[in-house]
Amino acid sequence: VKAYEAGEKPDIYVGGSSEIRHLGYSVQKSYEQIEELMEEIIRQQNQRRKSEMDALQSQINPHFLYNTLESITWMVEAHKNTDAVFMISELAKLLRISLSKGRTIIRISDEIQHSRSYMNIQKVRYKERFKTEFIIDEDVNDYCIVKLVVQPILENAIYYGVGNMDEDDGGKITVHGEKKDDDIYITVEDNGMGMSEEVVDNILSDNEKVPKHGSGVGLINVHNRIQLMFGSQYGLQVYSEPDEGTRIVIHIPAIPYNEQNRVELEKQKYGKAKVTDEEK
């Protein structure tokens, strides 16, 4: 036992009377369980650090920012000042929420505003080749969500879905948010070209079959960040068929947004700490 306390792993002789053998087995089993627990904690910590770094890097995509500024420059040169002002305003909203004072947990209303601004900018880039509709129940706005989980799904809807469709094809992306019992579901659905069964089966894994271009890695990151914050019963669900479109569902617990809940969640104490129903 003293060797265990010192961090060593001595061989245990299990022999003698039945009581001694039982004690030996118990000590050995306890140590094995502690080792497994420590390995799991280390794995989760490494995964959390990786997910947080990936999220930080995706907050302001240099290519997206460059393309947006190029579009604004073109508008100014073409004397489309009203359009340029609109784009600058949307970009400012997007950057404000992306940074959000370094917070990881934000209101769903802010996440949806970020998504609206992102899509308004992308629609200009894609020359209005698709439409976007947001159907968000008002009663979900003041609940907690992990920051920047909708944008990568919208990117996926453009890349795999409507981005390559002509304007006459009627491309559309719909974002729907609703609360059911103690859970919240945010669904992003498009009527684009869809994904193969192989891609769907692997897109939320680290499998090498996941495409490394587009937002395949982004979806894995979103799924991992949600599960690390709220638990393995939450995350993303992906449904898609070639030429039929794609539907991706974000599933999170319904936790009212207030300062106490935000702080507790960001400390990774959900499930142990007390979250409140009070709004601030």
Question: What do the PLM-derived regions correspond to, one by one?
Answer:
Residues 1-239, 245-251:
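Two-component histidine phosphotransfer core
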Residues 236-280:
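C-terminal end segment of the histidine kinase catalytic
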